[in-house]
Amino acid sequence: MIFCKINIWYNSLRDTQIYSYVICVLLCKLRTEKWNVKFYQREDTIMDANMKKRNELLAKTVIKGLESRNMSGYYAQDKEAALKQALELIPNGSTIAMGGCMSAHEIGLVKALQDGDYNYIDRAKLEPREGLMAAYDADFFLSSANAVTDDGVLVNIDGNSNRVSCIAQGPKKVIFIVGINKVCPDLDSAMKRARNVAATANAQRFDIKTPCKETGKCFNCKSPDTICCQFLITRYSRHTDRIHVILVNDTIGY
């Protein structure tokens, strides 16, 4: 009888020990996984903070270059800040025209102008020539840059050339909305970006027949439908306070 009680007690203790061991293993595994999640989340947060800081420093470098070229530069930490900065530059009642600027749409600027106290020229409702003439006489012209060098040179490529012509002359002021993704180390890489990234992406928007539309790669073509007709390199603005560039710490536009 005593032996049986001891045996039952021993088996019960053994089961309890096994149960406790299993619980400890599970808790350790859970804690490890939880710590790993926290570690990776912390790592991602650090990486995001590092990239944000890098982009901010890069933007300051670009802005310094723009200012040396008689152009004004602004840093926006996100799309909302970019929208606020753009609206601060445009007084109520202003006449605004625009080329094909996806970045202005992405930050909500086009909708804000359409809904606000502004005279927004919708070129889609006008004949091409009429829209171009209206843009030349506008108070503000909205655009993005296909690329910008880190020392402040703006690079744009165009098909019909209405956009690059308005950047060069005509509208009283030009506001560029430029994602930090478009900053390049030099003019050569900026021109390559305009051809190989911006133009090949923009080609997808149009009903055209070009090699880049079919393959996504630039072939330096002379197709009748090519949208790479005119390069505009803006290295200096003769007119003070005409060109304003808002650099957005985000990947926007083509």
Task: Give the predicted meaning of each segment.
Residues 21-24, 36:
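Acidic/polar hotspots within intrinsically disordered regions
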Residues 10, 17-21, 40-41:
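Low-complexity, intrinsically disordered or signal/transmembrane-proximal segments
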Residues 55-142:
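N-terminal active-site beta-alpha-beta segment that forms phosphate/nucleotide-binding
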Residues 136-254:
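Conserved phosphate- and dinucleotide-binding cores of soluble alpha/beta proteins
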